[in-house]
Amino acid sequence: MMYCVKTFDSLYEELLDRAQNRPEGSGTVAALDKGVHHIGKKVIEEAGEVWIAAEYQSDEELAEEISQLMYWTQVMMVARGIKPEDVYKNL
């Protein structure tokens, strides 16, 4: 299977670019326009799905849920102006 490898930083840059350039039809732009309350609900939803996948689903399904949680976490970062280095200093 061929796939594009993204890093935490490259995903952040991609989302930041979408926020700044606002491509038509972008789900990221739509989520940012709805605000942190909407984004926060998605973070919570995906966190729950990670837990359920860890308990009851395959490793592949778990990895997919983790990727969705990372996406929504980074959308929240963009919405709030938090940069990856702000997160890294707390790891």
From Swiss-Prot:
Entries under Pfam families matching the protein: PRA-PH (PF01503)
GO cellular component terms given for this protein: cytoplasm
GO molecular function, one term: phosphoribosyl-ATP diphosphatase activity
Pathway given in the UniProt record: Amino-acid biosynthesis; L-histidine biosynthesis; L-histidine from 5-phospho-alpha-D-ribose 1-diphosphate: step 2/9
Keyword Cytoplasm: yes
Entry keyword Kinase: no
Family affiliation: Belongs to the PRA-PH family.
Stated name of the protein: Phosphoribosyl-ATP pyrophosphatase
Organism of provenance: Corynebacterium efficiens (strain DSM 44549 / YS-314 / AJ 12310 / JCM 11189 / NBRC 100395)
